[in-house]
Design a protein with these regions (language model features):
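C-terminal catalytic "cap/lid" subdomain
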Residues: 1-251
Length: 251
């Protein structure tokens, strides 16, 4: 595939800082990197699918996310390298219908090959794992909720004591500017201090920060985070014209 650009036509003005149905003041992201877009696609951004941008990443072809209902809008441009942004995050995504699986095995966790045996069970059931947290005697994992969890748990019970709890959701904040910045995690969890957080993760890429909460708390968490991190958006990265128009009406 050789092309100058790939156009993806959707029903929104490109990638947004959050789901506009949850945050009416969500902003259009003007430009974002392939790496950042791939993270958002995996963690639930509705306008992208991971397989959609993979060929473009491999060929270094820019991707344009445009609105078929508003073709004059510039949309979002996805490029190989991220443009510098003074804001730590570009967007907030949420992935619902997840289940936390907890395994406790005080004797076996330290034995050689234990984690391999656990993940082999998930592989046998073709069950992808989103997040993993381990301690001396336990493992917590998150998976998509499905009807086969009882069978999965039954097989895992041969390795450990197993419990699982559904109706969870993953909140993911994505931005290349969080690398090496002090205090970002403190700001994130201060913004959601009124919400119970079950698991926390920062990816090896260091461009995303994720945590698990109850599904019922998703909208409140996204709105709180958006209010905390997009109060003074970088106009080079975000389309602030709509927000300025609303503010001028209220003056």
């Amino acid at each position: 595939m050789d092309a100058e650009a790939i156009e993806i036509w959707t029903d929104v003005n490109g990638i947004m800082t959050a789901d506009p149905r949850v945050c009416p003041d969500a902003l259009r992201v003007k430009t974002i990197s392939f790496e950042e877009a791939a993270e958002l696609a995996y963690f639930g951004a509705k306008v992208l699918h991971p397989a959609t941008i993979l060929p473009a990443v491999q060929k270094n072809i820019p991707v344009l996310v445009l609105n078929s209902r508003n073709p004059e809008n510039e949309g979002t441009r996805i490029t190989a390298l991220a443009t510098h942004c003074r804001s730590p995050f570009k967007s907030i995504a949420a992935k619902k219908r997840l289940t936390i699986v907890d395994l406790v095995a005080s004797r076996m966790l330290l034995s050689h090959g234990y984690l391999h045996a656990v993940f082999e069970v998930f592989d046998n059931h073709k069950c992808a794992v989103d997040m993993v947290s381990t301690s001396e005697v336990s493992i917590s994992l998150t998976v998509d909720s499905n009807d086969h969890l009882p069978e999965l748990a039954a097989e895992l019970s041969k390795l450990a004591d197993v419990t699982y709890e559904g109706r969870k959701a993953l909140i993911c904040l994505v931005g290349g500017n969080i690398r090496g910045q002090n205090g970002i995690a403190a700001q994130v969890f201060h913004a959601v201090r009124h919400i119970n957080v079950r698991m926390i993760s920062q990816g090896a890429s260091e461009i995303n920060m994720s945590f698990m909460i109850d599904e019922d708390d998703v909208d409140e968490a996204v709105r709180s985070l958006h209010a905390a991190f997009f109060v003074d958006p970088d106009p080079d990265i975000f389309d602030v014209t709509a927000r300025k128009a609303i503010e001028s009406v209220h003056l």
